[in-house]
Amino acid sequence: TYVELPSHQNKVVRFTVSNDNLKDEFVLIDNIPGALWHDGGRIHFGPDGMLYISTGDAINPSLSQDIKSLAGKILRINSDGTIPDENPFENSPVFSYGHRNSQGFDWNSENIMVASEHGPSGEKGRAHDEINIIKPGQNYGWPEIVGDSDDLRFINPALHSGDVTWA
């Protein structure tokens, strides 16, 4: 992934390597809001062969709850950049939403997706770095909740750091 300045729009591209040179740039996905912080930017092929991409909220927390925005999400696309028919939102690369700044993810031995996320360290005394079990179409709550909540619209983290930060 990389960002194009001055627009701060992130994108994921594929290149062909020939004689130690990059050529044949192919954009898999673009128009991902970016900023100086909270860019996410992890990419990983899942056990289903799909490409997963974490995006931060681009220091605009409300984008995490906007299903039309690609910020504050985990995205899922085919290796050619098209959107899988099985994605939870029709014609959308959004796989899960309500993320602040997911820093990494992987799948356990049972093919369950697990993601780490930076909490809002220093902001109003909240920290709550999180470990989340990612499920398709689910809302992980940022910025409406931090840590655990009784609000059934949101998925609670599997684990969070409380009022301290791990990272």
Give residue spans per PLM region:
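Acidic, Gly/Ser/Thr-rich repeat motifs that build Ca2+-stabilized beta-propeller blades
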Residues: 1-62, 104-120, 163-167
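Beta-propeller domain segments
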Residues: 57-167
